[in-house]
Amino acid sequence: GYPESHDKDRMMYEAITNGNGAGAFPVNGNLTNALNRMGAIGATSILVPGPKMIWHFAELGNNQSIYTCDNGTVNDESTTVPGDCKLSTKTQVQWTENWLSDTRRTSILSDWSKMIKLKTTEPVFMGDHTISPDASNVRQRIYIYDNSFPTTQLRNVVVLANFSVANLTINPSFPTDVYTYPMTWYDLMNNNAPVVITSPTALISVNSGRFRVFGNQPSTLSNIDFDVASNEILVYPNPAKNIFSISKGANQIEIYTLTGQLVKSFENIQMEQE
């Protein structure tokens, strides 16, 4: 699945052009409010089990129409001759406007990166899921679970998202099959901060365009960056045909083709072993 397609206009352009202009936090014509929703969009798409297609972290919320012409006008699918300017050369606004210094943009990169790490390292995201909005789609709830796991492991994840133009409370309807309340859940996108839940239906406040991700156990993700310099491993010769050596010992080495196919796996390799 995917939240936006390469042959349809960008989410942020659609939001600020055709989005809801009412309420306390309108998105129509309000780039900040629109960008604030990108985290929730990621949470309700990336975290759902199964493959996802994204492009450059949604281009950090690029709000330029894909149908922008050389002169700055937009010739989209609603015009008499639609899509004339889809292939026109466009200003790369992410560089001219220095988006890497814009926290509204970089928060998308940060949030989506965390979600990708969470999904690709926690086995529960290989399990099942249920989508069950609270009364309407603006109060979105997604339940991700693997009932074969013990409760001492991360076996349940609850995603809440508020797509309204107002701050709302959401009934989380936390699972009760193997849990008793009060109990502690963990905010997986906030450094595993513990949250005491007194009742599975106790309302949780979620600001407009925001989201929460709860787990029955903390994520095992480490916050420590991998130090490439001190953990450098050299493989030589490169390229190699029949044999190669490594500069350090390793518990396991796997070799893949450029298309992702596993070619060979080695275990307990010693330094300089061929």
Locate the predicted segments by residue.
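Residue-level detector of functionally pivotal "anchor" positions at catalytic/ligand-binding pockets or at interdomain
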Residues: 128-135, 216-236
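Conserved, mostly hydrophobic/aromatic
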Residues: 6, 45, 57-59, 115, ...
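Surface-exposed beta-strand/loop patches in extracellular or lumenal glycoproteins
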Residues: 163-179
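Solvent-exposed beta-hairpin/edge-strand motifs
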Residues: 175-192
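C-terminal beta-strand-rich structural cap/linker in extracellular carbohydrate-active enzymes
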Residues: 197-220
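Alpha-amylase-like alpha-glycosidases and glucanotransferases acting on alpha-linked glucans and related
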Residues: 1-48, 125-138, 150
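C-terminal outer-membrane/trafficking sorting elements
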Residues: 226-274
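Glycan-recognition and catalytic regions of carbohydrate-active enzymes
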Residues: 50, 54-57, 62-157, 215
